[in-house]
Regions:
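Class I S-adenosyl-L-methionine
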Residues: 1-285
Length: 285
């Protein structure tokens, strides 16, 4: 079965053209970390994800999420490269050269987001532009989601979509995972999403502020210690539990299902140790 286009229109965040695409209906998801979950991608509909990333146009789908990194000119990037240790300097200079060869004027640096936009988001964008997906209403799509596991925002923030797009899917899914940074700029929308969504917190102080609204949070912490091969979070609060997937490789999101906001009445919020390509930049958030 073809992937489904659930929304194709202006971003609620800034009015730019975006599209929401439900994937995984025909083939099992290969993401070992999440398990076989249906995935909802939210991307710019008018430009390649890499272009959006390096120009800041991804704000249409990610809002003010600090994980996006920052946009600088190539000249500024060269100045920054000159101040870095040898390995990091070489890596940034290589990226600057690639950007220049592509005709870019700007580049994204210090990105903490784990999503590699040149992979799945780009594949999905190209297929969308080739007309390989069909349109469906959220209510129609809910028929295929019912009883299955759903990962909303495999890329992009569901706060970029009008109310009523993801809600019907979340209501019938057996397991839901979703995260939003919209509490940084639109708390009213964040509270709506909190019924099945974790509010992304960038530090413990922020998480505690969100808890007062009744929401659950997902927080990434740079304060961790490696114990017996496991990154154990040091600043975990009494109202938090460490993400099980970060403790045991045998656990996947589909097995766990804790990141579903208030959907099942789970009390504790979730914290995970920083990891991946952007971990080095997370401590500065």
């Amino acid at each position: 079965m073809k992937n489904l286009i659930l929304y194709d229109g202006p971003s609620v965040i800034d009015g730019s053209p975006i599209v929401a695409i439900l994937t995984g209906l025909a083939n099992a998801t290969r993401n070992a970390g999440t398990g076989d979950m249906l995935q909802l991608y939210i991307i710019r509909s008018d430009m390649m994800p890499e272009v959006a990333r390096h120009t800041g146009a991804d704000a249409a789908i990610c809002g003010d999420c600090p994980m996006r990194g920052r946009i600088v000119s190539l000249d500024e990037a060269r100045e920054i490269a000159a101040t870095l240790p040898a390995k990091q300097r070489t890596q940034l200079i290589k990226r600057i050269k690639t950007a220049q060869d592509k005709g870019q004027d700007t580049i994204n640096i210090e990105r903490a987001c784990y999503v590699i936009v040149s992979q799945a988001p780009t594949i999905i964008f190209k297929a969308y532009r080739r007309g390989l997906y069909r349109e469906a209403t959220p209510e129609e799509a809910a028929q295929y989601v019912r009883g299955r596991a759903l990962r909303i925002g495999a890329y992009g923030d569901s706060a970029a979509l009008p109310a009523g797009v993801v809600e019907p899917l979340a209501a019938v899914a057996d397991t839901v995972t979703n995260y939003t940074h919209s509490a940084c700029y639109d708390m009213s929308r964040a509270k709506q999403l909190a019924q099945f969504t974790m509010l992304s917190a960038d530090n413990l102080k922020q998480a505690k502020r969100y808890w007062k609204t009744g929401a659950r949070t997902f927080r990434v912490s740079s304060a961790w210690t490696l114990i017996d091969g496991v990154r154990r979070v040091n600043d975990i609060a009494p109202d938090e539990s460490q993400c099980p997937k970060t403790i045991s490789k045998k656990v996947s999101c589909i097995d766990c299902g804790l990141c579903d906001g208030l959907k099942r009445g789970i009390k504790n919020s979730i914290v995970a140790p920083s990891h991946g390509n952007g971990a080095a930049y997370h401590a500065a958030l």
